[in-house]
Amino acid sequence: VQYAQTVDKDDPVISCPFAYNRIFFGAPGTGKSYLLEEQRKKYFASPERYERVTFHPDYSYANFVGTYKPVPLKNEAGESIITYAYVPGPFMRIYVEALKHPDKIYLLALEEINRANVAAVFGDVFQLLDRDDDGNSMYPIHASEDMKCYIAKELGEEPNKISSIRIPANMYIWATMNSADQGVFPMDTAFKRRWEFEYIGINTSEQQMSHYNVQFGQG
């Protein structure tokens, strides 16, 4: 969050020795999700410090970031009523947690990222993927009124103190991607350049699984 008055950029944050925006890619079955999960358990072990979501063709910006939705409630008389509220998606939930706890690192894990139209899913959040040397978003985006109210409520601030948002340096986004599969969406160059790609091949997968012993039945 960028406040309308001042922003303290000197708050120290801890980190892990990997890229902030990272995609594990390779053929299906090569262990991409396994490797991501092993590193997740090492650096983001607490359940409240990560969220995992699987992309699919119908996944949208509203699912990923958040949107205004009807929410059922009970009034004082105990009657069911429908009201509307901003319902955050996994991106916004992890983003807010990272802002609340700048001394901890948080992970958003995106499985099968290219099974959705990433340009549509990320929307204006796409601009936040450019990070500076400290890991913060280089360029802020304008926060909608609904988003401002939600963030302000979570942080105990006034909405008018929030003018824009940036991804903080303690928030990591890692993803898996099938490079040879049907039913996937292409990624444009502008999107790709904002990520560090790590190829997971057959040999890499074999090395990851080398410490397991597999016993076959007799007879």
Predicted regions and their residues:
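C-terminal regulatory/interaction module of P-loop NTP-utilizing enzymes
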Residues: V1-G219
